[in-house]
Swiss-Prot record:
Domain notes: Aquaporins contain two tandem repeats each containing three membrane-spanning domains and a pore-forming loop with the signature motif Asn-Pro-Ala (NPA).
Chain ranges passing through the membrane: 12-29, 49-67, 93-111, 136-155, 166-183, 209-226
Organism expressing this protein natively: Sus scrofa
Gene name of this polypeptide: AQP1
The protein's name in its UniProt record: Aquaporin-1
Job description of the protein: Forms a water channel that facilitates the transport of water across cell membranes, playing a crucial role in water homeostasis in various tissues. Could also be permeable to small solutes including hydrogen peroxide, glycerol and gases such as amonnia (NH3), nitric oxide (NO) and carbon dioxide (CO2). Recruited to the ankyrin-1 complex, a multiprotein complex of the erythrocyte membrane, it could be part of a CO2 metabolon, linking facilitated diffusion of CO2 across the membrane, anion exchange of Cl(-)/HCO3(-) and interconversion of dissolved CO2 and carbonic acid in the cytosol.
Modified residues (Phosphoserine): 249, 264
Amino acid sequence: MASEFKKKIFWRAVVAEFLAMTLFIFISIGSALGFQYPVRNNQTSGAAQDNVKVSLAFGLSIATLAQSVGHISGAHLNPAVTLGLLLSCQISVLRAVMYIIAQCVGAIVATAILSGITSSLPGNSLGLNSLAPGVDSGQGLGIEIIGTLQLVLCVLATTDRRRRDLGGSAPLAIGFSVALGHLLAIDYTGCGINPARSFGSAVITHNFQDHWVFWVGPFIGGALAVLIYDFILAPRSSDLTDRVKVWTSGQVEEYDLDGDDINSRVEMKPK
């Protein structure tokens, strides 16, 4: 663990997570907030249409940033994804902790900037996740679990280095998965499926009502996705010793921007 801490590529990856998360939150929530402004020419905007726009904003921003920094950090951009890859023994405990901190700080910074830019917006919630009227915490938890499960399952499948049948773009597939999660959950919980995204809005608005739902749900969903993929759908043969080695020291094969160890396939490869 100490050896990974001393590597430049490790800190590049942490910085990449912070910067990408800041851009992701600013672009996606900024796009969602824009739909609250009055529509010009006396036109009205339907809720269903707005949901599609918001879903696409989140999905496309993830796809774009995953393509941009995936070769540097793996582009997790989500503590639930980071937890999933940790439980799947693809990253070390140290990397997981530092990534989650970077993601949360990035979300807070982006939301704070948005707060200043959109301060005149009436009823500005800064994308705060909250349970819709009639939705209790248990139902919201279930929605967050399912929405995150399909996302982390997609990440595990599209970044599985054992596969030889992968075609197309992994970042785009993951972006569509994020959009799909929003289409499912946005009317029930505002769609968290990303604890850091929810945390940034809660911190800046000082509103933590039912906030636990947006941490517990995604983490359960991410853990279930690992259980389903790694132990049922595509079992891994790694023994306990190998798994512990990854948790303490990280993956043996890493993408190095200095060219020390560059693998042939690097697209969205988790570090």
